[in-house]
Amino acid sequence: MTDSLHNAPIVLDNGSGTIRAGFAGDDVPKCHFPSFVGRPKHLRVLAGALEGEVFIGQKAASELRGLLKIRYPLEHGIVTDWDDMEKIWAYVYDEGLKTLSEEHPVLLTEPPLNPRANRDTAAQILFETFNVPALYTSIQAVLSLYASGRTTGVVLDSGDGVSHAVPVYQGFTVPNSIRRIDVAGRDVTEYLQTLLRKSGYVFHTSAEKEVVRLIKESVTYVAHDPRKEEKEWAAAKMDPAKIAEYVLPDGNKLKIGAERFRAPEILFDPEIIGLEYPGVHQIVVDSINRTDLDLRRDLYSNIVLSGGSTLTKGFGDRLLTEVQKLAVKDMRIKIFAPPERKYSTWIGGSILAGLSTFRKMWVSIDDWHENPDIIHTKFT
């Protein structure tokens, strides 16, 4: 086991919508795929046509999608089905990385303010089932800041399951200032599905919901001024060029109008879908205002975006406008939107796990057997 502690650590970015895995020190993850498990929903009539009862990875996400009932084991950053989570991790090791789990320490990412039980079970499975030699868990947003080359800033990380704002100053997180809302990309997909149904386009199976996710990624945008945009649509003055056309897998064409900006609007106004959460702009300002007065100016001038939902067209511009409305007058606000922000959590993990000092940060399997609570006392 001592030898395995010297091998390159594996960075496992365990996202609610996408899992990314690879070796520390690499520039990009070696494998990434939607973090769902697919099971055949029809009776098998041809022996040997499809081997296995469970399908994971790119094959399940593309060519077999229509045959499968799809389930995500992670909801809002919390694992709701550990059996399926274990299957996904096994697939990562066997097919994605083609390596043995017991030969590499692991850096596992997680959202902030997650239940302790989630980390306990993750550690138990990785140590007991996969026999990993050592484990370290890190908050996703902090890793995104490392990837941007900064040690000070507030990261707004909005992925598929969770959106959170995390202030970091000179490499230290300010725990009492972290803000989290369980509104993110999957909620946008579900709301778009509802809006399309009202327009006469019905997507009801779990596989068709994946099609809606692809539509969302392709055509949605965040309106700079949603009220003005709504008025233009109501008055039918909207430029026909604003109507997007999307070709469905069966060749039919879908015309999408105001749904394009109405769906992602829930990130800024979750009350649209009946959720009593503040918007993403509000959690950024709240998290900064909870820090010491001396830190705020530096944080406002270093707002870093991370996660797939921030890639929505117009997101950064709208965020800047909304933060300016809430911030102190004449405050200098700068938002950084790294082009690789879909992977920035993984990249930050690769940087951190590649440092020689990383060995001092992790918990070895022996330490964990002696005291399982060490994963809470040693990691923030």
Curated annotation (Swiss-Prot):
Question: What's this protein's function?
Answer: Involved in nuclear migration. May function as a component of the dynactin complex which activates force generation by cytoplasmic dynein.
Please give the organism.
Neurospora crassa (strain ATCC 24698 / 74-OR23-1A / CBS 708.71 / DSM 1257 / FGSC 987)
Gene3D superfamilies found in the cross-reference section: 3.30.420.40, Actin, Chain A, domain 4 (3.90.640.10)
Keywords per UniProt: ATP-binding, Cytoplasm, Cytoskeleton, Nucleotide-binding
Q: What is this protein called?
A: Actin-like protein
Q: Which GO terms describe its molecular function?
A: ATP binding
Taken from the UniProt entry, a GO cellular component term is: cytoplasm
| Subcellular localization, as worded in the UniProt entry | Cytoplasm, Cytoskeleton
Which family does the record claim for this protein? Belongs to the actin family. ARP1 subfamily.
